[in-house]
A protein has these predicted regions:
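Polytopic alpha-helical membrane-helix bundles and their juxtamembrane interface segments
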Residues: 1-204
Length: 204
């Protein structure tokens, strides 16, 4: 199968699987399938590091579906580490962002972490969960910065959407209930993962 056809097929099936998760069905396990599909697509193209990051995300989704928060955090932390490794291996950009832009983005990420530290983490009663969330948040934001440094729109937007989704999860779980939280969490999550996949395809 040609690269373009493979790309169209992988994205199309992902969109269908993700859309099924929002349908009013009795089986709500569709959420574990989209990332497994993307992982298999990357594996079929011998993109092993990308496939590993997506597979760890799939395992995180499985743990989330089973409401196992600590294993969920652990698998997504492994996914972020693998994404960071992936970005270090992908084709580097022809030019880097100017230093003021890089510093501004770092300040934005630091502000997000500071907000989580002051607003979300103190409301977590389990010290193990709080510690895991603190470490995971650092890895997530490091992944976001690594994606940003590639000057690739898909990678940057995908990583930012990943951050948005996880921030909403934290607020919804520990601060206050967010109306339509499932949509608010899963739409940016699915879009973010898809854009990370698409962006990585362009740099392999």
């Amino acid at each position: 199968m040609s690269g373009i056809r493979h790309h169209i097929l992988s994205v199309s099936v992902f969109i269908v699987l993700a859309a099924l998760d929002f349908m009013p069905m009795h089986f709500h396990g569709w959420m574990i399938l989209p990332l497994l599909w993307l992982s298999m697509c990357a594996l079929s193209r011998k993109q092993y590091v990308l496939a590993t990051a997506l597979f760890f995300s799939f395992l995180g989704d499985v743990m989330g579906w089973k409401r196992e928060l600590i294993p969920q955090i652990g698998f997504f932390a492994l996914a972020q580490v693998t994404y960071i490794i992936l970005f270090s291996l992908l084709k580097p950009p022809s030019a880097t962002w100017p230093k003021p832009i890089r510093m501004g983005f770092l300040l934005l990420l630091a502000g997000i972490y500071g907000t989580a530290t002051c607003w979300i983490f103190p409301r977590v009663t389990d010290s193990i969960v709080m510690g895991g969330m603190a470490v995971y948040a650092l890895l997530l934001l490091a992944m976001c910065y690594a994606a940003f440094c590639h000057k690739n729109l898909c990678l940057t937007v995908g990583a930012v959407l990943f951050v948005v989704s996880d921030f909403i999860i934290g607020v919804n779980l520990f601060v206050c209930h967010i109306p339509h939280s499932f949509l608010c969490i899963m739409v940016p999550y699915y879009l973010g993962q898809l854009l990370l996949y698409v962006g990585a395809q362009r740099l392999y």
